[in-house]
């Protein structure tokens, strides 16, 4: 999980992968029951997000018109990075599903206008990735945006 937290030393730590112990502490109030395949997918998505972080930041900066990338809400940047990584890395997930899921997460966990901002950026990013041939989807119906 990516989060911005302030740990015992009082220093904010951004974009840190949490340890299993830290996750367990966060889940103390709300238990999350993960299936094996969900854990596997989550780890793969985190790895892909980290692997493509530089490229994702370049795309976000390019299409977040009139926004300083450092002023974009941290959660919005993380969601955008995750969506870009998922588009590039997971051939079995339709682009429409990736974008819709990220928008739902933004509506639920970020600011009131985050989903509109993310949708605008992702439309442009998706178009560029598609033109560049960076999105390789396999399976029936997966090439539709």
Q: Over which residues does each language-model region extend?
A:
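N-terminal interaction/assembly modules
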Residues: 1-145
